[in-house]
């Protein structure tokens, strides 16, 4: 019933696309977490029949937490070797909900999503087989937090070509595919080292011998920065860095690395450094919810590589997506629901104006200019 309603609302093409994206990113994320020793090797095959470990474990009684309805269905299927794909779909869905990083980065999956797992997902040459035996992604690649962003860019490349081929004005749902650009690493390093890095050295010239040899793209000014032009701050926690079109988080990740080194240099512990960066220093926004999820995951992976205590996702980076606007015809009713009592005319007027300004937030993103007096 939920699947039927979703198809009626969005159309079958968009529902297929949502399901494909959901499975692609979560399965890639699981493989990345496995390669970084943050979870058990749940996708690895245990036999020549390509039985995933998560299915083999369930057959031995080790079943992740799940709703009772799903558990009953799983128990009915477990003894049937012809239903491995169905078993896998139920188990991996439950695993995604149970694992803190996957759940908090990507959110809950719709009830019908497991029904849309491709039937050939476990076949020879299928997606899990490729993940387990790929010759194109090395172990070093799997340790790079940027990997999932690169794969997402490849994933949407066909859609991007379609959007550009039709020419003319982009529709709101086409903007993410059209504007996803993975900035080359040297450019990102140049940007970060000559902003955060330069500000830090201007305020802490004695640190130059520590960081200048590491910052290969730092540009030396022809003359020292005048005192009145130096951006002053009291503590590292005062340095706020925002990427307002953050995509999958490439620039945020580079900012994280540089800030982390600064915190360690100043004597903070690894855990303190990560928590302060997430709490105080980094902000990201993107109109593409998918990209926002990937940016969050990439930063969480980086945090776990510094200290595995972050595997419980007790703290998350502050990466946001632009909200889907409330239709104008529903604004008045929503305001009535929000207030226990009828708001004053001025408050009602201001909030109505705010909702109107947000009507194009999911297509304009951070270039949307808002002013409510």
Regions found by a protein language model. Give the residues of each.
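SAM-dependent methyltransferase catalytic region
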Residues: 167-373
């Amino acid at each position: 019933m939920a699947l039927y309603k979703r198809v009626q609302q969005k159309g079958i093409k968009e529902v297929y696309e949502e399901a494909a994206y959901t499975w692609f990113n979560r399965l890639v994320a699981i493989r990345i977490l496995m390669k970084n020793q943050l979870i058990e090797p749940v996708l690895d095959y245990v036999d020549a029949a390509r039985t995933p470990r998560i299915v083999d474990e369930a057959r031995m009684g080790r079943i992740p937490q799940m709703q009772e309805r799903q558990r009953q269905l799983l128990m009915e299927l477990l003894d049937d070797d012809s239903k491995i794909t169905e078993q896998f779909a139920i188990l991996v869905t439950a695993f995604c909900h149970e694992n803190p990083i996957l759940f908090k980065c990507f959110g809950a999956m719709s009830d019908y999503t497991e029904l849309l797992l491709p039937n050939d997902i476990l076949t020879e040459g299928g997606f899990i087989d490729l993940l387990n035996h790929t010759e194109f992604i090395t172990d070093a690649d799997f340790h790079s937090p940027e990997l999932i962003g690169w794969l997402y860019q490849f994933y949407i490349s066909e859609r991007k070509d379609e959007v550009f081929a039709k020419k003319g004005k982009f529709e709101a749902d086409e903007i993410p595919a059209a504007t996803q650009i993975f900035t080359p690493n040297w450019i990102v390093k140049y940007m970060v080292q000559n902003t955060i890095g330069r500000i830090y050295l201007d305020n802490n010239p004695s640190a130059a011998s520590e960081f200048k040899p590491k910052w290969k793209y730092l540009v030396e000014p022809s003359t020292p920065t005048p005192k009145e032009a130096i951006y002053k701050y009291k503590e590292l926690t005062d340095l706020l860095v925002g990427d307002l079109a953050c995509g999958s988080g490439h620039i945020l990740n580079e900012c994280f690395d540089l800030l982390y080194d600064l915190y360690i240099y100043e004597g903070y512990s690894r855990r303190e450094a990560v928590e302060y960066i997430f709490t105080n220093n980094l902000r990201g926004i993107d109109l593409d919810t998918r990209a926002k999820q990937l940016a969050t995951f990439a930063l969480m992976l980086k945090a776990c590589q510094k200290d595995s205590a972050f595997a419980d996702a007790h703290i998350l980076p502050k990466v946001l997506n632009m909200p889907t606007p409330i239709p104008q015809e529903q604004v008045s009713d929503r305001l009535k629901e929000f207030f226990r009592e009828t708001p004053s005319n001025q408050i009602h007027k201001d909030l109505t104006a705010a909702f109107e300004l947000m009507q194009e937030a999911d297509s304009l993103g951070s270039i949307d200019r808002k002013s409510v007096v």
